[in-house]
Amino acid sequence: MSDLHLLARQETKRRFIRQLDALNPDLVINTGDNFCSADSLQPLLDDMSGLLQRPGTFVFGSNDYLVPKFKNPFSYLLWGRSQQATEPVPELPHEELRQAFTSAGWLDLNDKSETLEVAGHRLTLRGTDDAHHDRDHYEEVAGPPDGEADLNIGVTHAPYLKILDAMVSDGMDIVFAGHTHGGQVCLPFTGAVSYTHLRAHET
């Protein structure tokens, strides 16, 4: 699950979150950007109460740390990322969110690696903190995959190539990310526009 960007008043979204537990997931992988305001934290945790009783892992996105501000989505096509706000942005209660998740038994993968058993299978996971705000330190978890694991999983919020390429090079079997909401810019019939198709790869 990713990019809920929850506000307490969003009843339709909250109902959707509450219904997710009925899917009976073996594992919840949360890739961040959970909420948009401090008063949304408790509603978020209430709505996720069923999921929080299941095995889970998480990394944070920018909107777990900071209140979101509108940015031009086309800036991704021009600069490879949206421009950062020039004015101070209020913080969100991210440590309270972290504490709630870890108290429920979820594994914090922000620049960390963890192993757990799910449905009789050994899973080894590594993750990064939010690359969109340069909080990522992949070097802290980099290295070869766990040869004894049934599945090696990479988790990050913003799918920046420096992280995706590193995880693939290190032998991750699958990588989960969020942030783009299906594409920052989507065109009729063709779908998401990727800046990697429009710009040369950075070297």
Predicted regions and their residues:
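Short extracytoplasmic
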Residues: 1-15
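Conserved small/polar residues in nucleotide/adenosyl-binding loops
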Residues: 196-203
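A mature extracytoplasmic/lumenal domain signature
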Residues: 2, 62, 127-129
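Short active-site segment of divalent metal-dependent hydrolases/proteases
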Residues: 6, 35-36, 64, 160, ...
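Active-site-adjacent loop/helix micro-motif of nuclease/hydrolase catalytic cores
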Residues: 8-12, 39-40, 136-139
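Active-site glycine-centered loops adjacent to acidic/histidine catalytic or metal-binding residues
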Residues: 3, 32-33, 61, 157, ...
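His/acidic metal-ligating clusters that form di-metal
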Residues: 23, 100-107, 112-193
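Core catalytic region of metal-dependent phosphoesterases/phosphodiesterases
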Residues: 12-117
